């Protein structure tokens, strides 16, 4: 029995399912999860000492690679001064100033500890600001595990949303309307039917939790125009795509300003940190200035802020995103070429430092299209690549991530492994 198997059996005795987040359990792909012993640059090593090229990067944060020496040094410098204070620090101001500089639509920002906290707080703030209750979200977009966001579409536009998790009361789900991603007609119909009830529309402008699916410019511009017309708050959930698709995130890429933005992952540099921010007039409704309550014991934790601030400084290096975008595109295009050469139906896409792999004839534009991908073939490909020492997301419904440490040699090794994997799939 491998060390990974021993650890997984042991973990299941004290941790539900043996993991602290469901996707880590390998339920989608089968087999035994890899327990990570250490990581460096683009690699990690599991409990059995096997090395893997890592295309998860802690699900997005590790944009400069694992254990970057400057991030490590920044963390080490603050450790001796104390781990947590429950009081303000100058470093909190510095990271807030950096975020506001990089994302111009954010005039003020509040630090929290997780993406779920950020989206949950942004929705409460939008409701408090507008005095309305209804939230609009989109099928396939994931915004954390707050009750009002674990909702799927009802049988028709005007029906109540349905919970996607046990434990979510129908009375909460009924305030959330779920529409098809990238469907402008459905969006216009919804605003025409109940536009004056909508407190906020929350969207991943680049979705990463139904695999990688880009928002179309037409869809996102329609969102901006309709929210403005009807007085609804437009919330961009950039927890995943923020500082991933461009230095200024999806808002820079598309040239669209949100009213509120949720950030996470990269801004913590691998530490637990997230944030939400936006227009000053909306943020003024937050306590202690306004009546919308939000708080957190570990918000602005000095260790997380040190890692995040240094990461935000590193990604501003000249040419950083040009190189990262080109390398990610080289990976995606190379995988598609290897599949094509083997005669395996496959498509790939990339934007910035995010990529998507689809066992389908074309890149999907909605959750419904994503679900038509060949999941069984993806699962086989995942394990073939795992055996080769390449670690992709253990689910056909997750995006992948490239770091600045994924150099040409790493990409070459990945494509060589993929050539063998696709050949095995075609056999």
UniProtKB/Swiss-Prot annotation:
Pathway(s) annotated for this protein in UniProt: Porphyrin-containing compound metabolism; protoporphyrin-IX biosynthesis; 5-aminolevulinate from L-glutamyl-tRNA(Glu): step 2/2
Name by which UniProt lists this protein: Glutamate-1-semialdehyde 2,1-aminomutase
Keyword check for Isomerase: yes
Organism per entry: Burkholderia vietnamiensis (strain G4 / LMG 22486) (Burkholderia cepacia (strain R1808))
Entries under PROSITE patterns matching the protein: AA_TRANSFER_CLASS_3
Family that this chain belongs to: Belongs to the class-III pyridoxal-phosphate-dependent aminotransferase family. HemL subfamily.
Residues with the N6-(pyridoxal phosphate)lysine modification: 265
Names of required cofactors: pyridoxal 5'-phosphate
GO CC terms in record: cytoplasm
Subunit structure and binding partners: Homodimer.
Pfam families assigned: Aminotran_3
Record GO biological process: protoporphyrinogen IX biosynthetic process
Principal cellular location given in the protein's record: cytoplasm
Transmembrane segments: none
An MF annotation (GO) of this entry: transaminase activity
């Amino acid at each position: 029995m491998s060390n990974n198997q021993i650890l997984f059996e042991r973990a299941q005795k004290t941790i539900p399912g043996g993991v602290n987040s469901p996707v880590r359990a390998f339920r989608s792909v089968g087999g035994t999860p890899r327990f990570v012993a250490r990581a460096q640059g683009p690699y990690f090593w599991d409990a059995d000492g096997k090395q893997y090229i890592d295309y998860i990067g802690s699900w997005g944060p590790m944009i400069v690679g694992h254990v970057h020496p400057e991030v490590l040094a920044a963390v080490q410098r603050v450790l001796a001064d104390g781990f947590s204070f429950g009081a303000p620090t100058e470093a909190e101001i510095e990271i807030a100033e950096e975020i506001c500089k990089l994302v111009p639509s954010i005039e003020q920002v509040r630090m929290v500890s997780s993406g779920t906290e950020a989206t949950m707080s942004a929705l409460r703030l939008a409701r408090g600001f507008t005095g309305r209750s209804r939230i609009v979200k989109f099928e396939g977009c994931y915004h954390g595990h707050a009750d009002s966001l674990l909702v799927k579409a009802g049988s028709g536009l005007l029906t109540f949303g349905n919970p996607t998790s046990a434990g979510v009361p129908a009375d909460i789900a009924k305030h959330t309307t779920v529409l098809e991603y990238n469907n402008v007609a459905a969006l216009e119909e919804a605003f025409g039917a109940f536009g004056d009830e909508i407190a906020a529309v929350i969207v991943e402008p680049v979705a990463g939790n139904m695999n990688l699916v880009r928002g179309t410019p037409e869809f996102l511009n329609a969102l901006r125009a309709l929210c403005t017309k009807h007085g609804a708050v437009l919330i961009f959930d950039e927890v995943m795509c923020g500082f991933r698709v461009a230095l200024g995130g999806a808002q820079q890429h598309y040239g669209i300003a949100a009213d509120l933005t949720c950030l996470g992952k990269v801004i913590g540099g691998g530490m637990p940190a997230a944030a939400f921010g936006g227009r000053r007039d909306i943020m003024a409704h937050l306590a202690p200035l306004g009546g919308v309550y939000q708080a957190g014991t570990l918000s602005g934790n000095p260790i997380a802020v040190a890692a995040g601030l240094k990461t935000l400084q590193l990604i501003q290096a000249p040419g950083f995103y040009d190189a990262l975008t080109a390398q990610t595109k080289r990976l995606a295009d190379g995988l598609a070429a290897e599949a094509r050469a083997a005669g395996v139906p496959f498509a790939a896409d990339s934007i910035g430092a995010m990529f998507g792999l689809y066992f389908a004839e074309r890149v999907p534009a909605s959750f419904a299209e994503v679900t038509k991908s060949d999941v069984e073939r993806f699962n086989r490909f995942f394990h073939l690549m795992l055996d080769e020492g390449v670690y992709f997301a253990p689910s056909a419904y997750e995006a992948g991530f490239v770091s600045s440490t994924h150099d040409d040699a790493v990409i070459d090794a990945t494509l060589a492994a993929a050539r063998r994997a696709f050949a095995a799939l075609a056999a």
